[in-house]
């Protein structure tokens, strides 16, 4: 039969052997496995050995002793790798021969496969330990006892049920901390074993010209790929006690100490340490839901990765048999000690013994499992590849049909074996038998574990969350992420890699943090909601890092995580705010207590009344000792940032209009200016006393706000343009201090101290950037002037642009008499007669200079502030109206803000109401856009297609008034 499937001439056998019936077992082995054929080609001595005597199960023994003899002569790691690979290939080829010729039971084959793997791993470990001790010294604990590297074999290796071409899942550990002795330089035990483990993985896993020994997977260790490669017993115990999850309990059921020795105290201690984590003393029914979630996760992975023809993960497959057994082990293993067993095949009859399953159910599961494992081993032996997917090519299908038609199987309750025969001769019949097994297993699974069609699976939203929950973990894979993101139409495929980078980087950081079991469980449930919400929107690439940064700052504050998870209104509001403002995202990350206020729509948006900012600031600072200057300044910054956050939230959520936003930002700045002046005054006066001309509680000092501050039009990131004035007589001195100085020097030191407070950079950042260049004579002028000197300068020396700047001024700090004195200077200066032609010319020249230096000069873009038709043009129009008409209409000089200047122009008959309203509309629309761009930390530039109507009207008004 075999020769009709693959002619002997294709097997590259010697010509004199091609027609001999005696070599039929060899033909069978080569037919079943390309790997066997390749191994015989590479190792002709093995072929000669087989032709002299074909392999038998008795030849598959003494791996440890045979390896020890061979490795005793190995001089270096390169040779070590080569010898291990050649040994592995010879022995696997031998086992494939035995399997394909049906010389042993299915169970015996994977027991030998497991023993071979264990021997190879331990041989490599022991050789490397000696080499590392020679290089670094011998690792010892504080008692001087030599430490060893213990290796936990997980999964099928631990259960002694390894596949032909399985990965091996390992966890490395060592008993005690300490240092090496006897080396050139002592190193910590952790470094010694980490270096040794890295070399061991390389020896086993690296693909060389000789192939590999075993693909090695370390992801089952604490914290997965992000965790340390080797842990001490203490670190491992701490992890499993504090952070171990149910899926890790599930995995640990099969954990085996490789080379386990009951006389070894370290081996005994490690087993005793892990047992309470895996097996609870009570009946642990809470594990059922965890197991069901794990199975549903795998089922979703089957769909996501198109694994429907996978005999391991598919419905009724290997994994479901394992789930049934391990469910009972997790629930009852602590009480029923006979369930504390690594081998699935040994556990199954014990489930019947405990009446947890019927005899029929156990036999069904046992027979199905053996059939599946025969399929799996045959598939993997073909090309030495780890696969559980049924083949689509006819040659592999024929191999599978032949191998699974009949085989030896061990009896369920004894050491005896029996011959199993299935009545199929082709692929279709094979699939029918396989389907019968799968249906039988699935029925038992549903009876024990429960139906998978839960509400989560029926609800598309919950199903999406479940998919996210499956993949959002420390070992997130781009392949899995891409599969989930395909369900979000607004996410472009080119974005997948960047999204993966954000998640991967974040999770790698989180794995090292003491988040705790409760916190990690909340994160497991919260992150899917965050991801689902973010990727439903347009701005996911901007929003994802902002929100991850917030969550990053609260990972160890479980209360906040729970708040975000339990209060449904928090997440949508948080995403709405963060999508429109980088600033808000950063502030919430810095001050997580603001999350509390997201619980109600009015919470975060409940801004102060205008007149309450000053008292609110006083209340905020009262908790800080007066002598702690830096803490007070830091408090000022925190108060400012918190209040700006509230204003921004009210802006984004539509609670405040644009004019009110600027009002709030301006009054907030005034409250802070008031606090800064008082703080500076106290410090300067404690040293120098106070100017002698002052009455009690007077300061004789005023702060003049220019620009946006003066015009009550501050933005989120506006500087403060300030000028300082005082009313001290020329020959005045200070009194009551440690040192007397002139009053002018006093006010100069006061101004310097105010500047210092504003500019001090603390952990909360700079309070405000302060610009003093608008003072008389600019940077060449005095830092603080008298009222008289200021008036003289404004009326006799100021340039036209300085008079323009004076339009937008207010006294923002000072006693009432000083405010009145300043306003008198301002209005009288603005009301001076001016030649309208010269005024227009000078304003236009200044505007042209600004345009040349500051505009975008782009046909595709529009700079909202500096380009023609933008905010600066509107401001210049308002300033022109004041300077040109205040002499005739004093009312024009009253207001410092543009909107009320335009209102006054209507009252004075200078503008029509329609012109005023349209200018106000243009101004507020452009300012509103700038506000929102600043929240996103973007420049004040938009596409040239925006605001075309507004820009056209502003240019028209410019031509009408100033051309």
Swiss-Prot record:
Catalytic reaction(s) noted: [glutamine synthetase]-O(4)-(5'-adenylyl)-L-tyrosine + phosphate = [glutamine synthetase]-L-tyrosine + ADP; [glutamine synthetase]-L-tyrosine + ATP = [glutamine synthetase]-O(4)-(5'-adenylyl)-L-tyrosine + diphosphate
SUPFAM superfamilies: Nucleotidyltransferase, Nucleotidyltransferase substrate binding subunit/domain
A Pfam family this chain is assigned to: GlnE
The keyword ATP-binding is annotated on this UniProt entry: yes
Keywords for the protein's UniProt record, in alphabetical order: ATP-binding, Magnesium, Multifunctional enzyme, Nucleotide-binding, Nucleotidyltransferase, Transferase
GO biological process, one term: regulation of glutamine family amino acid metabolic process
Domain of life from the UniProt record: Bacteria
Enzyme class: transferase
Start and end residues of each stretch annotated as Adenylyl transferase: 461-963
A GO CC term attached to the entry: cytosol
Span list, region Adenylyl removase: 1-453
EC code(s) of this entry: 2.7.7.89, 2.7.7.42
CC cofactor: Mg(2+)
A molecular function GO annotation: magnesium ion binding
Family assignment from sequence similarity: Belongs to the GlnE family.
Main function: Involved in the regulation of glutamine synthetase GlnA, a key enzyme in the process to assimilate ammonia. When cellular nitrogen levels are high, the C-terminal adenylyl transferase (AT) inactivates GlnA by covalent transfer of an adenylyl group from ATP to specific tyrosine residue of GlnA, thus reducing its activity. Conversely, when nitrogen levels are low, the N-terminal adenylyl removase (AR) activates GlnA by removing the adenylyl group by phosphorolysis, increasing its activity.
PANTHER family in the cross-refs: BIFUNCTIONAL GLUTAMINE SYNTHETASE ADENYLYLTRANSFERASE_ADENYLYL-REMOVING ENZYME, GLUTAMINE SYNTHETASE ADENYLYLTRANSFERASE
Name of this chain's protein: Bifunctional glutamine synthetase adenylyltransferase/adenylyl-removing enzyme
Underlying gene: glnE
